[in-house]
Amino acid sequence: MLKRKRIVAYLKRAPSDIRKLFREPLLLIGIILVNVFLFLFIVLPLFKIFQLSFEVNGQFSLGVFVDVLSKRYNVQPLIHSLNLGVAVSILSTVIGFIFAYAVTRVDIPWKRFFSVTATFPIIAPPFMMSLSAILLFGKQGFVSKMILQNLIEFKIYGFYGLLVVETLTYFSTAYLTLYGVLQAIDPALEDAALDLGASKGKVFRSITLPLATPGIASAILLVFSQSLADFGNPMILAGNYTILATQAYLTIVGMYDMKGGAALAILLLIPSLIAFCLQKYWVSRKSYVTVTGKPSTTRIKMDHPVTKFSIFGLCLVLAGIIFLFYGMVFFGSLVKLWGANHSLTINNYKHVFTVGWEFIKDTLILSSIATPIAGILAMIIAFLVVRKNFPGKRLMELVSLLTFAVPGTVVGIGYILAFNQPPLVLTGTAAIIILLFIFRDLAVGVQTGIAELQQIDPSIEEASTDLGADSSHTFRKITLPLITPAFYSGLAFTFVKCMTAISAVIFVVSGKWNLITIAILGSVENSDLSQAAAFSVVIIVFILLALWLIQFLVNQIGGGRKIKFEKAEALQSR
């Protein structure tokens, strides 16, 4: 009976919503165009993968999967990927929690330093840690050869090497998630437990940790998804420990088996979708937020000398390891030829800005085109989802956020299947790379915009509408200026992801348009580690310059407000 009433109520409302749309042609056109874009560049590529995998001679069939799974060299990568994902997610979450707890709950110095250290991996190429691992612990490594004279053999290729580099790469996601969780816990609850005679250790075990449990689960699922999707690190360090993302790539590129590669992509997609659904629709419903206004009490601090100095020492060691890895890349970029001639030189940078300039130029051009388009489109979708009522609104939101769950390898395969044949042939052009950049990380901008709009009183925009302005005018003149920080945070995040992309774009790059991350991968494969290091340093420098420029624009337009780039990354957990 209740369902029937809801259906009747919806049918009564729907015509009114549709009539409102027809009164605003620009709004109607905008909704149609957004849905067309989402279908073409998110839904269609995924559909093409499923179509190729489940269709044999025009008939539905599981034959491709039977064939793929009958080969041991395809089953092993699936098991390896799941094992690695579980291990990386647990270890990353432990380290992320230590940093987050130290910054929010422990009375230690250098909190800002530890916070910056924990977020630095976000702006670095995801496979930079693998490069550093080779420079440090490879056969010609700084530690293994120069210090230990090869007395100890470090097994950096395989499971343990990947575990270390992926943990150091992705623990920042866990840190940002758990930092927000711990900040949201009302300190009055912890103070009340202390007043009742509980020790600070007891408060941690009985109050803080249980309230943070959903956030911990969310962090584990997020890092698990990132580990499954990782492509660059396994390409460099996997050795004989093959994983699914690289196996799908090698199946297509090396064996020319498109059907087999598509089937492997679906096997990679399934656990990612499960993790996404658990994180979004189960964990996120378990509330850990206890602050509903400004806390009336100060947050307790762990100040016991043993606890304080133990956590401080642990954070210091972890920060030292992180800086050692990144510092080694900078040092390696100044070495003439790693492993043969360790004299210092700047010739690698000369090579980067001469022979490698085409890679830099193409990356900057494509990223600079994609970033503002992605930012504006994300804000439009957020505006439509939060402020407008129309049929299919929830579906639009779901599709726009779908790329959260889809690994880059799956997206790349989908794009070459969807846009390598009429009516839309884009392979080999700059357009396919730009479109992939736009829609690959669109979800972060949409989520950032939605979060910001939900904090703004809609009466401000309603006043504009009451004065005769249509939706497009209200969006340009009222909404967009109000969400400037979210807009620029989305721009910053998108630009960083464009500059460091590898897993999806490796399928669509061509001789005419290439990317700096492809150049780094090629240099590593050719054992030219010094040039790879120089390219990596240049990426970070350009990213930092871009972030400074975006912050400068915010200062000019937004009255000195700071962009929250880390917030865009952290919103993936919500």
Tell what function each PLM region has:
Residues 23-58, 70-183, 209-232, 263-280, ...:
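Membrane-water interface segments at the C-terminal ends of transmembrane alpha-helices
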Residues 7-11, 53-63, 136-149, 237-245, ...:
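Peri-membrane helix termini and adjoining interfacial loops of integral membrane proteins
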Residues 191, 199, 286-302, 338-352, ...:
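Juxtamembrane inter-helical linkers in multi-pass membrane proteins
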Residues 231-255, 340-341, 502-529, 562-570:
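Glycine-rich helix-loop "coupling/hinge" segments at transmembrane-helix boundaries
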Residues 1-33, 280-316, 551-574:
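Transmembrane alpha-helical segments of polytopic membrane transport and secretion proteins
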Residues 246-271:
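Helix-loop-helix hairpin linking two adjacent transmembrane segments in secondary transporters
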Residues 14-19, 61-69, 344-353:
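A short amphipathic helical element positioned immediately N-terminal to and/or at the very start
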